[in-house]
Design a protein with these regions (language model features):
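C-terminal end-helix/capping segment
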Residues: 96-123
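Short, basic amphipathic alpha-helical segments that act as recognition/interaction helices
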Residues: 26-38, 101-110
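Beta-rich strand-turn-strand
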Residues: 67-76, 81-90
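Helix-adjacent hinge/juxtasegments
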Residues: 31, 35-69
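Acidic/histidine-enriched, glycine/proline-rich intrinsically disordered or flexible terminal extensions
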Residues: 117-136
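Extended intrinsically disordered, low-complexity coil regions enriched in Ser, Thr, Gly, Ala
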Residues: 12-18, 24, 86-102
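A positional/architectural concept
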Residues: 1-29
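Short, structured motif recognition centered on aromatic/hydrophobic residues
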Residues: 1-3, 32, 75-79, 83, ...
Length: 136
């Protein structure tokens, strides 16, 4: 998979020639992090209580699927088959920058998810007080 020049430039700020890709346990997409950002997340995951089932499940899903991938000189990464299969990736993918990470979606999956988000609107069942100060 080729990374757009803009993303390559952003990852270059971290002085990393590789990234970590793992699954998103909440949706059928992949999460791609610079190595240095993933190290922070993994440290937090490692501190979760090992006797809590939900914590162990999250560790198994995120850390268990975390894969270090080199970015080649052409700005490409080779996603392993299990990650591609999880996210239902085919030839067309969508990359969504999300701050310090990038979501990798199969184009068809993203189109469906985006339509669901739009149909649900901002009046979904979850209310976040922290969003009340955001103006678009």
């Amino acid at each position: 998979m080729s990374l757009p020049a803009r993303l390559r430039d952003e990852f270059a700020q971290y002085d990393d020639d590789s990234v970590v890709v793992t699954i998103d346990p909440a949706t059928r997409c992949l999460l791609m992090y610079p190595i240095s950002e993933w190290d922070i997340i993994q440290e937090k995951l490692d501190k979760l209580p090992s006797f809590q089932a939900q914590a162990r499940r999250l560790q198994r899903l995120l850390v268990g699927h975390a894969t270090d991938l080199d970015i080649d000189k052409s700005g490409r990464i080779l996603l392993p088959a299990p990650l591609r299969e999880f996210a239902l990736l085919d030839k067309k993918v969508t990359l969504l920058g999300q701050g310090k990470k990038v979501e990798i979606w199969g184009q068809d999956q993203w189109d469906l998810q985006r339509e669901d988000y739009i149909a649900e609107g901002m009046h979904g069942s979850e209310q976040f007080d922290s969003l009340t100060d955001i103006s678009l």
